[in-house]
Curated annotation (Swiss-Prot):
Keyword line: Antiviral defense, Cytoplasm
Protein name: CRISPR system CMR subunit Cmr1
GO cellular component: cytoplasm
Subcellular location: Cytoplasm
Amino acid sequence: MEELLMSFKLKAIYPLTGGYNRHSINEFYEENVRPTEIKGLWRWWNRVLFNTVSYVKEGKLYTYDSIDRLFEDVFGSENKKSAVRLEVITDEGSDNHFELSNVELDNVIDCLKANREEKVNLDFRDNTLIIEIEGSTKIPISFKSNLDIDKIKDLVYKNKLLSFELLGFKSIKIDTKISDKEVIKEILRDLITNYLEYFNIKQEVTFTLNIYLDKSLKHKQNFDAKLKFALHSLLVFILLGGIGRKTSRGFGGLSIVNAECHDGLCGEIYGIVNNMESEKEKKDLATVLPNIIFSQTIEQYFSELINNESYKLRSWNNNSDFFVYYFIKDINILRINRIDTNVNRNGIENILNRISNELSASGNCLKDLIMQEMRRRAFALAFLGNRKFRNIHEIYPRILEFLYANYIKREFVNLIGKERRLSNLRFKILEINNTYYIISYLLYSSYLKDPNSSIKDTLYQFARCVI
């Protein structure tokens, strides 16, 4: 029998929830926030927290698949039904429904038909959508939409990451020799829709997350410990993570509006949530958050699981061809600042823009801290994530030398470009009782060397400069 275990009323700040295609919405589903995304992220943060506790208590790390096997009673697996089901109820007005109508394209088509092949560019200036043909002819486009572009355009234009992504939606080459008028119209309409849709970014999305527990399933030993550990990892995910794209750059950060507990199994987590405001007043938030991550209570749950079901776990080792992430006690929360949100939320948008513009080797903060370019690029490659490389030789030898010497274990240098890597240095916008904070923290990884005092100092100074 399925019963409601716990409910969270959550708020996401500037979530980019369109998925793989970089849109604000996805053609395959209408929901702005999906239970499957939440559950996938929850499972990932559960792996992070389990390895965090394991590294503190045993100095060991475990593979993600073996951690999933240990927690399959909670999250389910290919052959086992999940004991928990998530339900997401989005508040009215928080959806990303996009409408576009009455698009006037006749003048553009007439201009295009006079030529064989033309490149068409879109731009939005002075609240007017303009089509520019091969850099000469500029035609204003009349249209109707439910989207207030003026409300969000400054965030998109001033944010280096967003403005770069927008380039992929603003131009197309049309061969008018093989395209009749209706085909051209359809191509142009798709171009305009994709371009305008990129501006469909909500300042905030509020939703209720209901967690249901199926009590009819025959749970194996230590189920309560597993569930309580998993609920703790959900709390860490909410406090330090987010939904959608670019969460490491501050977008989509989650905050708790309120919480309800309907079963004794969630009593401890409910107590932590309720006490956060009073704890924040007694202690600095930079103390409260690590206390939650490195809680003695979850260490007890960890010990119970290790003592009884360690046979399910497989140790991660230096021969592995993948990385795992975890927190370390030496360096985790780097910097927390209160955000001034007095003027139309500009404080939050300014922070988001600054984070995106600074988190690269060409950012002013890193230039001020690390004068030598190759050393600076090595630092960025080690801590700020990277795209996938075709091979390691795409990296300059001098950068590799600094990576070997300071940041990355030599045996993993050949693997750091194998897949796209997460940024270890992450930023999160968190709201507590109508006060907004920007948090910078370090999520460590198995490919990184133990940080010396100089590297720690650079990380702290860099976070201080950015926020």
